[in-house]
């Protein structure tokens, strides 16, 4: 890829490869993603899907030695609850859609607390901080990124 600041500097293209996950021995998802910070991706996805609520719910997480994939074990009751919901996973690739869940929304478990809605000005500040930290974003002009915030500052960046 040629797109450096001078218009001629060669830049490395961002890798995007398949990464699979099995939960309790069953295939759960395959992502197309940059192969960085995959352990954080796995934990975050398991949390977002409801397989884990706390650190102790992640009984084990093993990476595959031969290819990009992980085996995760969670408590059987949590696994059964998620799998028993009326959901149909649709794997999609591209910006904004990796896994889309179709099904009965009333069956999706709700969090115990409702997060606060951040201030718009503070949200803009946090997004600017997110993009400022992205080395690949700076060199390519665009790449997927994520951050964890407490609403005041960025706590972690990927």
Annotate each language-model stretch with its function.
Residues 1-151, 156-157:
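Intrinsically disordered, low-complexity regions enriched in acidic/Ser/Thr/Pro/Gln residues
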